[in-house]
Amino acid sequence: MKLFSIFLIFTIFIIASALVAAKSAADVTELQIGVKYKPASCEVQAHKGDKVKVHYRGKLTDGTVFDSSFERNSPIDFELGGGQVIKGWDQGLLGMCLGEKRKLKIPAKLGYGEQGSPPTIPGGATLIFDTELVGVNDKSLSEEKSTSSEL
């Protein structure tokens, strides 16, 4: 009986360790930027202070989509670097070309922090955004290009 109890405690410890390691692997501590598509010509680039228009799909690390401008067919517009969006966006969209698509993996400290944004975004959540820059100041993509929901 004592041997079984030790075995059971050891098994529970191993499973708990694996779960903690799996969560840690999904979380990031620094902003990660992946370029998914970049136009051959980059004549218009996003800089701090520019008014940008961005299509996006936001997901948690488990794949749960919490928001998407693609489904609404309504990109968000804001001043880049002006603190109107989460810090991960202000940093991750800098230098993006008009028509470029990026995947941003944003740690909680550059997202919604430890408080999250209940009920859809839990505290401490790493966020994943598929983004497409569809407008910079007075320049924009044609409607045909900006309505694609596949990144």
Curated annotation (Swiss-Prot):
It holds the Pfam family FKBP_C. Induction: By heat shock. Residues 49-137 form the PPIase FKBP-type domain. Inhibited by both FK506 and rapamycin. One of its GO terms (cellular component) is endoplasmic reticulum lumen. It is an enzyme of class 5 (isomerase). It is found in: Endoplasmic reticulum lumen. Keywords: Endoplasmic reticulum, Isomerase, Rotamase, Signal, Stress response. Residues 1-22 form the signal peptide. The keyword Signal applies. It comes from the Eukaryota. Its main location: endoplasmic reticulum. One of its GO terms (biological process) is chaperone-mediated protein folding. Gene3D superfamilies: 3.10.50.40. Ubiquitously expressed. The keyword Ribonucleoprotein does not apply. Belongs to the FKBP-type PPIase family. FKBP2 subfamily. PPIases accelerate the folding of proteins. It catalyzes the cis-trans isomerization of proline imidic peptide bonds in oligopeptides. This is FK506-binding protein 2. It comes from Vicia faba (Broad bean). The gene is FKBP15.
